[in-house]
Amino acid sequence: MSRAALLVLADGRFPAGGHAHSGGAEAAVKAGRITGAESLEAFCRGRLHTSGLVTAALAAAAALGVDPAALDEAADARTPSPALRAAARRLGRQMMRAARATWPHPELDVLARRFPKGAHQPVVLGLTARAAGLGPDDAAYCSAYEAVSGPATATVRLLSLDPFDATAVLARLAPDLDRVARAAAEAADRAAAEGVDALPAASAPLLEIGAEAHAAWPVRLFAS
């Protein structure tokens, strides 16, 4: 295993399509819930401990070898918004393309055939980590970081927020990232022993509501 593979996978320039999605930040900016660095930090912390925990646990479980089809079904059950489910599958399809080109692996091929329109992104992320020789802890960290880095980067574009301030927000969230990644990896261990019902099912209703409203906008900067 090369831990450097984690740097490649977590790099915002990895061609997995995440740059086109705001993680709910665009809807939150329009609603006035994100107005600057302080409110961005609150938004990211809330997202991290809810949907971020869910996706990190799914990714960790996939990296651990839990059945990806069962994990995909679990992801559907934990994503009430049709718009978010569709976005997760689009991102999963794009990540699959990047993963198969970067770390070819039979398990990726099997998942791609089973879900030709895309499996949920965290499931693909976890299986990609597995293909790269990484472990469930690595997958959990990568997914948890995506949960906050996406909105932070999007807010720089949406509000012309100083990139230094956005990066400082991410740095202040580091202890939360540690806690969420650790909880996600522990949940993945339970899922391997007890089944996917052992995975967390934390919810963030405003993210779901905002995603549905955002999907209906005639003009928007981000896909979700």
Label for each model-derived stretch:
Residues 2, 6-69:
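Glycine/small-residue-rich interface belts in oligomeric ring/scaffold proteins
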Residues 4, 33, 37-42, 131, ...:
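C-terminal auxiliary extensions adjacent to catalytic cores
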Residues 6-15, 42-49, 77-84, 110-116, ...:
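A short glycine/serine-rich beta->alpha loop
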Residues 15-23, 35-39, 50-57, 86, ...:
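Conserved active-site and cofactor/substrate-binding residues in soluble primary-metabolism enzymes
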Residues 25-26, 126, 153:
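Short glycine-/small-residue-rich flexible loop motifs, especially phosphate/cofactor-binding loops
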Residues 27-32, 47, 51, 62-66, ...:
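Generic structural signal for hydrophobic core residues of well-folded globular domains
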Residues 56, 61-134:
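Internal, conserved structured core segments that host functional sites
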